[in-house]
Amino acid sequence: MAMVPEITCDEVDFYRDDDDRQFYEADGPNQKKGYFQYPDLCSKESLLEEDGIQLKFTTQPHQFHQTVMVIVAIEKMKHLNGLSSQFFQDNDLMNIFTNIFQEEPITFKNCDIYESDSSFRLVSSQDCTIQDINQKCLALSKASELRALHLNGRNISQQVIFSMKYLLGDIGSQKTHVVLCIKKNNLYLSCVRRGEKPILQLEQIANFPSINVEKRFIFNKVEINNTTEFESAEYPNWYISTSQMDEQPVFLGNIRGGKDITDFILADF
């Protein structure tokens, strides 16, 4: 229930300004003195029933700006449609606040999204050993060359342990991307072109990057039944391969299901 201080039917001094918002400023508005007559408030028995508002007069002191706020609210309510024919509801109060107070605009900034030169980045790793389907192990020769050979219990320690690092690649790609590193020596398998065809080589890198991984180090890990193939991401249809013969270098070949072996068996270490 809105309450205003007692006033008379005579002319009442008041302060006004063209902008209603100045009534709520902390330092007060640029005040102009004037006069107004408010006949609807002259009688204490007067009820604004057509607006659904009941006014009760009291002699309790009120601050001037509180009185002005009530008068401003009443004036704005009298110009709202639909209040006189129905009970005062929550939506009506919300409409009053919307008319009295001005909402501040919401500001926002546009942000640009940039794509990295390379979309490959490391996410996890797995230590494992790798053998071809003829049970030849991969081992380093004295010349730091990766070879495939049969090892028995006495020299099985020559078998290298790989750190197979998994990468996130292109969005929507169904392929599994990995990097193969000989863990003990930080030797990374990579594919580069020499002459007319790509070859497989080892590169020693102390601090391998976790983002923007160059494509020559990346292999597509393809699982078929219980075996795995490693296809070069840089040179599609070229695979890590071993020879049918023993103690031959591991190489990059483009023949699957032929004399060269492209199927491997992985074992967690």
Curated annotation (Swiss-Prot):
Prosequence residues removed at maturation: 1-112
Pfam families from the UniProt entry: IL1, IL1_propep
GO biological process terms on file: cellular response to lipopolysaccharide; cytokine-mediated signaling pathway; fever generation; immune response; positive regulation of cell division; positive regulation of immature T cell proliferation in thymus; positive regulation of T-helper 1 cell cytokine production; positive regulation of type II interferon production
Keyword NADP: no
Compartments reported by the entry: Cytoplasm, Cytosol; Secreted; Lysosome; Secreted, Extracellular exosome
Annotated site location: Important for interaction with integrin: K175, K183
GO cellular component, one term: cytosol
Single GO MF descriptor: cytokine activity
Keywords: Cytokine, Cytoplasm, Inflammatory response, Lysosome, Mitogen, Pyrogen, Secreted
More info: IL1B production occurs in 2 steps, each being controlled by different stimuli. First, inflammatory signals, such as LPS, stimulate the synthesis and promote the accumulation of cytosolic stores of pro-IL1B (priming). Then additional signals are required for inflammasome assembly, leading to CASP1 activation, pro-IL1B processing and eventually secretion of the active cytokine. IL1B processing and secretion are temporarily associated.
Entry protein name: Interleukin-1 beta
Organism: Trichosurus vulpecula
Recorded name of the encoding gene: IL1B
